Amino acid sequence: MFRMLAKASVTLGSRAASWVRNMGSHQLLVPPPEALSKPLSIPKRLLLGPGPSNLAPRVLAAGSLRMIGHMQKEMFQIMDEIKQGIQYVFQTRNPLTLVVSGSGHCAMETALFNLLEPGDSFLVGTNGIWGIRAAEIAERIGARVHQMIKKPGEHYTLQEVEEGLAQHKPVLLFLTHGESSTGVLQPLDGFGELCHRYQCLLLVDSVASLGGVPIYMDQQGIDILYSGSQKVLNAPPGISLISFNDKAKSKVYSRKTKPVSFYTDITYLSKLWGCEGKTRVIHHTLPVISLYCLRESLALISEQGLENSWRRHREATAHLHKCLRELGLKFFVKDPEIRLPTITTVTVPAGYNWRDIVSYVLDHFNIEISGGLGPSEDKVLRIGLLGYNATTENADRVAEALREALQHCPKNKL
């Protein structure tokens, strides 16, 4: 016995010596980066673009709280509180409600990867970039994608969608509630009931609308709803919220094939988030600090009340629109009834380069606004009054910045 231990010790010792010799035969060719020799410094800015938005002080403070393990009982309590907060802002009682460890794009993929199988018929409302993205993801899955293409700035009627449902017989319809690339608010009443008459599920993207616009997941018959953390909720970007009702859950759990993504497989995520009422099963390491922040952001909107949040966004944006009209700016969305109350799009004034305007507002006022995205690129300026930032004071500040930018930025007279 002792001889065997001694022999093992000699063997391990020779291996350790070999490792040391090998380490000595190599050199560090990459020096420590000079840029990392000093602490990080971030400029103070007012974020009035389409997102992310400024963090509320309480949310910002949550980011400096102590780390705990993601599979500890204290963390499970936080996760349960987050689930309750999501159920409140979604207005749903779905047990299968959780956070995806990834941005709104990841929530979109979570929905599509779990709901669609190769060969499934998928109907997409494409009136901005998010419909385009949903269609591309579904094509990669192998679904049969049918796009209802609209001009940027337009929305869908029940009649138009019914025609698509009757023609293509999809298993899933995708609509964007708040199309942040164009500034359109898509009405949702009646679409869930319509889809169900055609044995189709309704998937809604509410990344740019949640918290700023009324949405009622259960009452409006929405089968799958997702949103992001970084807009009205004023939490750090990088996590997203999602909920599946029983019809959607049944579709997921009766698949013939496994979802193409292990990371976003809802059958695993539901176990991690305790959605099945059983012992939680580890799937991946959760972004603990981001979840602290999301918990606090959901607490803030719960304390404020959804109806108060909706009203505040409506009033702040109405004031912004008044200021923009006084500047002579034209709204990209012509119909006032379908203008998104969280993100406003105005047409780039004739003769101006939108980049000059955005740069001037940032350089002289420390305010971030944005140009267009996807089909609205080079066509619009996007201004967001999101959550904590949705105030008439901020509307006045960005309007004054735009007024000065239009006076000083170069204008092409041709």
UniProtKB/Swiss-Prot annotation:
Keyword Transit peptide (UniProt): yes
InterPro entries per the UniProt record, alphabetical: Aminotrans_V_dom, Aminotrans_V_PyrdxlP_BS, PyrdxlP-dep_Trfase, PyrdxlP-dep_Trfase_major, PyrdxlP-dep_Trfase_small, SP_NH2Trfase/AEP_transaminase
Motif Microbody targeting signal: positions: 412-414
MF terms in GO: alanine-glyoxylate transaminase activity; amino acid binding; identical protein binding; L-serine-pyruvate transaminase activity; protein homodimerization activity; pyridoxal phosphate binding; transaminase activity
Span of the transit peptide along the chain: 1-23
PROSITE patterns: AA_TRANSFER_CLASS_5 (PS00595)
Keywords tagged on the record: Acetylation, Aminotransferase, Mitochondrion, Peroxisome, Pyridoxal phosphate, Transferase, Transit peptide
Cofactor: pyridoxal 5'-phosphate
Modified residues (N6-acetyllysine): 247, 256, 334
GO biological process: glycine biosynthetic process, by transamination of glyoxylate; glyoxylate catabolic process; glyoxylate metabolic process; L-alanine catabolic process; L-cysteine catabolic process; L-serine metabolic process; Notch signaling pathway; oxalic acid secretion
SUPFAM superfamilies: PLP-dependent transferases
Enzyme Commission designation: 2.6.1.44, 2.6.1.51
Protein family membership: Belongs to the class-V pyridoxal-phosphate-dependent aminotransferase family.
Protein name, per record: Alanine--glyoxylate aminotransferase
